[in-house]
Amino acid sequence: MEHSQRNILITGAAQGIGKGIAQACLDQGANVYLLDINEEVLNATVSELRSLYKTNIEAFACELTDDKSFKNALYKGVDHFSVFHGFCNSAASSQGIGPFETFSDKDFDATVNLSFKIVWTCLKEEITYLRDNKLTGSIVNISSNSAIRGYAFNSIYAASKAAVNNLSQSVAKEVARDQIRVNVVSPGTINTPGVEAYFAKEPSAKEKLEKTILLKRLGDPIEIGNTVSFLLSDRSSYINGQIISVDGGSSIY
């Protein structure tokens, strides 16, 4: 298995895409360290995964937008696992949907904080950890195909994810000499709990959206996870600085 004896840290791992990434890595033999702000859901996920997998699964609830909080969580993980071989920064959120001109400064700050700064904070500490310890590694940041196509009525989120793409490629250029790879996975609409809740209220919106996806269905979190797992593995050793869309073909519809 491609992740046998490897330790991987995943943020935003309590549910949705982050949980799917954890499952995909576990399927390939990884030990995983799961971080999320939602302690209750995180603990439930850990219990579920431990019932399904035999490898080492640990978790810690923390505020991922705060560098001190994340650094503390990171080094608690180092104390337990000794070393990390890969990181996936999956945690993100958007504060509201609406016309561009209706967003307040508070909406802007909250969305940028939860969709861009959260990646910047974690990436900075991960790179520092790898470089300080003279380690190689692979990092995958989760973006969105809205960063490429734009996203009507969620413009701040789309712009924040475009910033994630550019940050990732910029950092990839800086750290490649240390044999640290940084890539981006850009999901389309994935069947997460939040998406399910929205479409339960707006079933016609789901039907309309699915028509714009070449495969005519929403994605599953494990499908994002499988791509991330590959990028975190040595099988992707010559892939660096790339933005990989996993969206059922919606970005070329």
Give the location of each predicted region:
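Catalytic Tyr-X3-Lys loop
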Residues: 85, 101-121, 140, 157, ...
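Conserved mid-core segment of classical short-chain dehydrogenase/reductases
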Residues: 71, 75, 94-109, 128, ...
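Residue(s) in the substrate-gating loop at a strand-loop-helix junction
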Residues: 144
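Alpha-helical segment proximal to the catalytic Tyr-Lys
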Residues: 128, 173-177, 237
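A glycine/serine/threonine-rich, flexible loop-to-helix segment
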Residues: 177, 189-212
